């Protein structure tokens, strides 16, 4: 950054502070009358220590080269009893796409599919499944009037059938449908066990403000509790798989924002049984670490691709590294 930018920042500092205070005050005035209706202070008197929780997350490494897009996706599922690990299982896919369209979208869908396959494989032996990300993100936001039928008779927990498709556009559609097929199987058979957890939700359904609901609640509440439970209907226009559409269309799911520890951050929880909200709080509170479920923190740490991982990948693939440390990566 050039020196002039710092000079301007020093000049503007007081104005920024004044404007920040004004914005905070105006926001407070606009929500204070409804805050008590939309936020419920609650901390369970008793908690459930003995429930088996399955925490699932995925990670990826992607490198675009002139020849194609090389990537590694991995997903892991850990079974916890309280905060104690009982066992775990992982899935990995190493692949290369030729240069073309939708590479990033397809890779993200592949990672998610590994997560959902693990969930479907292990769900029967646990009480609850903790999935990273909202239900709507898992379902996908790809509107289409054309349904995909080719995969409807096959729900695999081991293979990824969409990779057999060579056309990039078709592969993307098939991956969306394959994700939705596995997700619909999970929901239709085990929906009361599924908890979708988002730490960075941008939803504004509650307060209808320009700021996210979580931002407002973190600014103006400190106690443990949850926000008013809202209901959403699954829109079949977002479901490409015809079989998944039959299983999911018109089904309702619910969401709220939780705080498990005083003054800590909130997260959004999506679920299918509104009557079990107190049960969910009893289960999640004893595994909370600074307000977030520890099982998801642990599994995220295991699948995240860190600096040492990247260096090792480059070494194995014998890929050229930068000779000049400050040289922008896009130029080598």
Swiss-Prot record:
The keyword Protein biosynthesis does not apply. Its EC number is 3.1.-.-. Mn(2+) binds at residues 57, 132. It comes from Sulfolobus acidocaldarius (strain ATCC 33909 / DSM 639 / JCM 8929 / NBRC 15157 / NCIMB 11770). Induction: Part of the nurA-rad50-mre11-herA operon, these genes are cotranscribed. The gene is nurA. GO terms for biological process: DNA repair. Involved in DNA double-strand break (DSB) repair. Probably acts with HerA to stimulate resection of the 5' strand and produce the long 3' single-strand that is required for RadA loading. Exhibits both single-stranded endonuclease activity and 5'-3' exonuclease activity on single-stranded and double-stranded DNA. One of its GO terms (molecular function) is exonuclease activity. This is DNA double-strand break repair nuclease NurA. The keyword Manganese applies. Its cofactor is Mn(2+). Belongs to the NurA family. Keywords: DNA damage, DNA repair, DNA-binding, Endonuclease, Exonuclease, Hydrolase, Manganese, Metal-binding, Nuclease. Disulfide bonds: none annotated.
């Amino acid at each position: 950054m050039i020196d002039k930018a710092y000079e301007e920042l020093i000049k503007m500092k007081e104005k920024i502070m004044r404007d920040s205070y004004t914005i905070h005050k105006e926001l407070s005035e606009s929500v204070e009358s409804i805050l008590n209706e939309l936020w419920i202070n609650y901390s369970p008197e008793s908690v459930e220590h003995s429930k088996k929780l399955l925490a699932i997350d995925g990670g990826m490494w992607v490198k675009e080269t002139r020849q194609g897009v090389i990537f590694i996706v991995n997903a892991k599922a850990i079974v916890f009893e309280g905060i104690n690990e009982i066992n775990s299982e992982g899935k990995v896919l190493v692949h290369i796409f030729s240069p073309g369209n939708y590479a990033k979208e397809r890779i993200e869908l592949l990672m998610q599919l590994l997560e959902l396959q693990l969930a479907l494989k292990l769900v029967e032996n646990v009480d609850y499944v903790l999935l990273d990300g909202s239900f709507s993100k898992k379902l996908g936001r790809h509107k289409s009037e054309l349904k995909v039928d080719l995969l409807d008779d096959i729900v695999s927990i081991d293979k990824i059938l969409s990779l057999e498709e060579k056309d990039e556009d078709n592969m993307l559609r098939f991956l969306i449908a394959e994700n939705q097929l596995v997700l619909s199987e999970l929901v239709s058979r085990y929906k009361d066990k599924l908890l979708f957890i988002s730490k960075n939700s941008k939803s504004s359904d509650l307060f209808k403000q320009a700021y996210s609901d979580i931002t407002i609640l973190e600014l103006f509440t400190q106690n443990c509790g949850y926000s008013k439970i809202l209901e959403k209907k699954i829109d079949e226009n977002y479901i490409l798989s015809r079989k998944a559409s039959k299983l999911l269309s018109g089904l309702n799911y619910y969401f709220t924002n939780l705080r498990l520890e005083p003054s800590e951050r909130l997260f959004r929880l999506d679920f299918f049984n509104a009557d079990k909200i107190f049960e969910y709080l009893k289960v999640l509170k004893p595994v909370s670490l600074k307000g977030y479920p520890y099982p998801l923190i642990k599994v995220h740490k295991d699948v995240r691709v860190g600096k040492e991982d990247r260096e090792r990948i480059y070494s194995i693939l014998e890929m050229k590294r930068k000779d000049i440390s400050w040289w922008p990566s896009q130029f080598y």
